[in-house]
Structures are given as structure tokens and as C-alpha cells.
Amino acid sequence: MSEIEFNSKFFSVFCSYFDPHTMYLSESDKSDFFSSVSANNLSFGLNVSVNEKDEIIVDEIIPGSSAYFTEKVTAGDQVLKVKYKDEEYVIACSSISKVEALFNSTEYKNVDFTLRKKSGEIYTVSLTKKLLKNYENKVYSYILEKDNKRAGYIRIPSFYGKFENGKTNVSEDVAKEVYKLNEDGIDGLIIDLENNGGGSMEEALKLTGSFIDAGPIAVMNDKNGKKKTVKDPIKGSIYFGPMVVLINGFSASASEFFTNTMQDYNRAIIIGNQSHGKATMQTVVPLTSDRNPKEFIKITIEEFYRITGKSN
């Protein structure tokens, strides 16, 4: 077990003892986390998996990526080794965490990959990370029609923001979709937050403020017990018609923040199962003061309460 793997296991258990939402993050873990709450990611364009023989196999080539334009790499190819500058790692002899870092870290942008096709042919390609859109983690909308009524539907997979590589954020994207739906003459709006585990609380604040006219939207409680009232940062509303918000047991944190305020202001009807129940806010900070830190901690910094005083 490498030092990084040991630290990850030990400190994760240590942190969770004090707070279930605080966790240790390696550089690769941090990149994975920000990728999950971003609509844009730096990527070579290779989606890979580890098979039962601990071999890394290419599952998919992302269109528009560096791997795609080689016209050489195909699904089913096996990654044998990777090389970055003078560092070379043979997959069979290397820590999987190091290989993950090469794929996920923003530090490694130009890497040589040696792969083997099913035919046995071995070849090497030089790949460069490009900023690619994560279409699975981006807002989209369409119109549902029945009995001459038109309902706009907006799916929000996460509260993504302009983190490490992001060029867009959820509040702006939702505003664009609402504008388009309004132009098409909708009679009502459905916001789908099912399976949305949260993301940027700043984006949750902006999105919440976009659907109420003005007023307080939450009460924050910091580590010292100091409370502050958070007011609507966006004056006015982007939509005034009837609304429905869909949630389930996997809707958490920022999703609950938005949903609670819509309910407290009688702004929307909430439909679905009981949500996850996570009313805390985290931030990611480095554990060292190095210029390029390798270890981080995602730590709880505040609790948030509804304007009614409830936590959920």
C-alpha cells in the first residue's frame, strides 16, 4: 500500500469519526469531487475501467477529445503503461492511485499512453487533456404537453459551479432554460432534483433567489455558534408561474436548501419521497501551504436552517 493510499484510508476514517461529511482527499480524490459538480472537465477522452485481472481497459472514447482525434484508440484496448515527462508507469507494476492521478489531476496534461489492441498490436499515442463538456452533469429542459397544457421540465443533475475547470454554472444555465421555456409559452414549470446530491452552496443561493422576489432564505450557523440570516442575492424572479419540485431520498444538501425555501415561500409544490437530510456546508482546503498541495480536506464549516427554524 502506497503512502497516499494509507493516508486516504486512515484520515478518512479519522475524519468520519468526528463528522460524517468531513473527509480526507488526495489530489485525485479532489479532482474527482470537482468533476462531479462541474459541467466541464479536463480529460484525455478515455473512459476506462479495471477488469477482473486488474487490467485497465478502455470502455469509451469521448467525441471531440484528444483520444478521439488520434483515430487509433478504440474501446477494448488495454492500457499497458503511461509516461509523463521522465516518469513512466507500467500498469501491472504501479499503484492504481498513481494511475488515477495521471488521469484526474490537472498537473498531468500531456501524457504518452502505450496500449494493446485485442489483436495483440501494441502502439503508443500522445494525448493532451482538453476541456470537455460533461453532458451528463448539465441542465437540460423540454416541454410536456397534455390537454392543451404545456409544462416546462428542467432537469438539474447537480449544483455545479465554476470550480477548477468549469466555464458555466447551474444558476446561469437554469435561467437560460427558463427564458427559452417562457418564450415557448409554458403554463407551469417542473424542477427535477431527484438524485441530485448537491454541490455548490453559492449556486444554491443564486438559484433559490432566482425564484423568489426578495427576502431571507436561510439561517447559517458557523462553528462558533454564530448565526446569520442569508438574504436573497438575486432581486426579482425569473419565473412567476406555478411550479413543482421533484425530490427523492438521494436529493441532498443544496437540493434540500432550494426545495425548503420554495416550500417556505409557498413558491412550489414538493412531490416525491423524503429527502436525504443533510443540512451542512463543506469547503475543500489544502492540508499544506505548498504551492502545489497534494492532500486536502473537505470540512464542514456551517449548518443551515430554514427561515422557519427547522433544519430540514
Each model region followed by its residue ranges:
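GHKL-family ATPase ATP-binding module
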Residues: 9-11, 15, 75, 188-190
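Metal-dependent DNA phosphodiester-chemistry modules and their immediately adjacent helices/loops
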Residues: 251-253, 295-312
